Every structure is written in structure tokens, then in C-alpha cells.
Amino acid sequence: MKENVAEFLRRTILKIPLSEMKSILEAWDFLSEDQLQTINLKQRKDYLAQEVILLCEDKRASLDDVVLLDIVYTQFHRHQKLWNVFQMSKEPGEDVDLFDMEQFQSSFKRILQRALKNVTVSFRVYEKDSVWIRVAWGTQYSQPNQYKPTFVVYYPQTPYAFISSCHLKNTVPLLHQALKVASKHHQIVHLDLRSRHLDSLKAIVFREYNQTCENYSSTTSLQEASLSMCLDSKITHENTEEKVRVHRVTQETFGTYPQPQLEFAQYKLETKFKSNIGGGLLADRKEPFRCLVKFSSPHLLEALKSLAPAGIADAPLSPLLTCIPSKKMNYFKIRDK
């Protein structure tokens, strides 16, 4: 095994938590069950890494093999990446093609390798419904940097792809071109939707977040919830009817199901100064006023959902706050109509 491959493997092993080491190595599916049994998972991680390297040397592990381990690690820790959502589209009236995984991978890799001399492209099908793509970028004069790859998660037969942040901005258009052509789409656009929680982004774009409420009877549930609210002796209601109304409006707006997990929402406002009183310095200003408001929380939508019931905000909340899942965006630009 080459020295640079061994070092890449060592660093990959070192970043895996000991509690997940066995699961990740098993999911990697490179070492045999007997080899995995010989690994002492209770020793110091640097010794453990050396033990794994020796086992991989016996099997003549290549760079491609170690890259697959890095993909598996990233799948376990996908929340460590900031994911951007992209939506592709076909020409009007264009037929939907049957998806061929081998053809997709070949086309994607060919486009990148024709444009760039030094690039490493790897694939891993995950849970049969998505393909994970890992791209390590190099330059004309340097080998691909395996420590700063870009990840693409594409769901075949859908127009959606999720791409992690790329440190080389000049490669982004090429990546979009490869994805668009390989998946046989005509156009790709960046949705104003980002998060570290890939599963929540997927739930939003595929509208999976409300599946748990399909058998939900709103009238009955609201009555039961309101009754339990009134019977709770620990809560004092100054206005029971208002509390019931707030509870009803909140459930109508957010539903009873868990909200997708997003960490932030950003609103950019651009507006011209308006006044019924003519003249003045501000009225003559040609440049619009600009304002940036950012909401952040470990679980923003659940936090917004709790505002009105907690008495912090009036119900219903502004549509700008509640439309995030339906609009599929958490970056907004608000301008004069």
C-alpha cells in the first residue's frame, strides 16, 4: 500500500468514534469477518489505526478502497456537512428515461475527467434509493486533495440532489454540468434551502415530514388536547378560550408531527424609503435600505412552533416563518412589490 494511501487510511480511522468503529468497518465491507474479530477495539486509537492499516496492507488496499471508507464515515456523520439543495428539470414534454446506474456513473465521471486532469470520483449506492458521489479535486499541477472532497447525494428518478459545500468555487459549475448531463436533465437550479440535517432536507423536498398524520382526525385530537390542557392543574389559564385558539391555530399551521430539523432561516430585506412628506435626504436616496435578519436554533421549526403556545408571539405566526417547508427554502429575499 502506498504511503499516501496508508496516511489517508490512518487519518480516516482516527476520526471515527470508538463507539462506531465496529459498525463503520462492517459497513465498509472490505475486511472479512475474521479480520474484524482480530481488531482490539479497546486499545488507543492510534494503535488501532495501525492494526487496521496492517490488515489492509495484507489485502492490498487501494486508494479507491479507502475512499469508500471515507464515504461510509460521511454517511454516518452527514450532519457534519452543510448541504445545499438543487432541483433539476427536463425540457417541456420530454419523456422520463429509465435510470441506469452504470451509465450514470460512467457519464458523471467522464465529464469531470475530461475537464480536469486531476480528479478522483467515487460512488456508493446507499439504501437502494440514493447514490453517494465523492469528488476529490486537484489542479493542473497538484493531485486531488482527499481531505477536502465534495459530496453529492442524488436520488435517481427524482429531480433533487444534495451537495455539500465545495472549497473550490470554480469547480461548482463543472459539478453541476456533470450531474445534469449524467441524470439526463436540461437545467439545474439552486434552491434557497440549506442545512446540516440531510434527512430533514430530504423530508422537505419529498414532503415526507407529514406522513405520520395521514390518519389524524383533527377535530377529535384538538378537542382531546384542549381538554387535557384545561385539566392540567399546573397550568393557570387567564383566558382558556384564547389558549384553545392558539393551540388550534398552531396545530393547523404546523400539524401534530415532528418538524424537519433546520438550524437557521435568513431574511434579506431591500426597500426604498417611503414618506407622505415630500423631500428630505432619505426620500432622495436612490440606494435601497438593506436589512438582514437571521433566526437560528438547534431545531428552528420546533422552536417557531412553540412560540405562540408559550405566549412569546401571537398566533398565527407570519407566513414568512411558517412557509419554510412548503416553499422549500430557508433563505428569503424580500423586496418592494
Swiss-Prot record:
InterPro entries in the record: CENP-NAC/CAD_complex (IPR052011), Chl4/mis15/CENP-N (IPR007902)
Q: Which residues carry this modification: Phosphoserine?
A: S226, S233
Major localization listed first in the record, in broad terms? nucleus
Q: One biological-process term from Gene Ontology?
A: chromosome segregation
Quote the cellular component terms of the Gene Ontology held in the record.
inner kinetochore; nucleoplasm; nucleus
Look up keyword Iron-sulfur and say if it applies: no
Kindly state which keywords UniProt assigns to this record, in alphabetical order.
Centromere, Chromosome, Kinetochore, Nucleus, Phosphoprotein
Localization of this protein:
Nucleus; Chromosome, Centromere; Chromosome, Centromere, Kinetochore
* Family per similarity comment: Belongs to the CENP-N/CHL4 family.
Provide the function of this protein. Component of the CENPA-NAC (nucleosome-associated) complex, a complex that plays a central role in assembly of kinetochore proteins, mitotic progression and chromosome segregation. The CENPA-NAC complex recruits the CENPA-CAD (nucleosome distal) complex and may be involved in incorporation of newly synthesized CENPA into centromeres. CENPN is the first protein to bind specifically to CENPA nucleosomes and the direct binding of CENPA nucleosomes by CENPN is required for centromere assembly. Required for chromosome congression and efficiently align the chromosomes on a metaphase plate.
Subunit notes for this chain?
Answer: Component of the CENPA-NAC complex, at least composed of CENPA, CENPC, CENPH, CENPM, CENPN, CENPT and CENPU. The CENPA-NAC complex interacts with the CENPA-CAD complex, composed of CENPI, CENPK, CENPL, CENPO, CENPP, CENPQ, CENPR and CENPS. Interacts directly with CENPA. Identified in a centromere complex containing histones H2A, H2B and H4, and at least CENPA, CENPB, CENPC, CENPT, CENPN, HJURP, SUPT16H, SSRP1 and RSF1.
Q: What is this protein called?
A: Centromere protein N
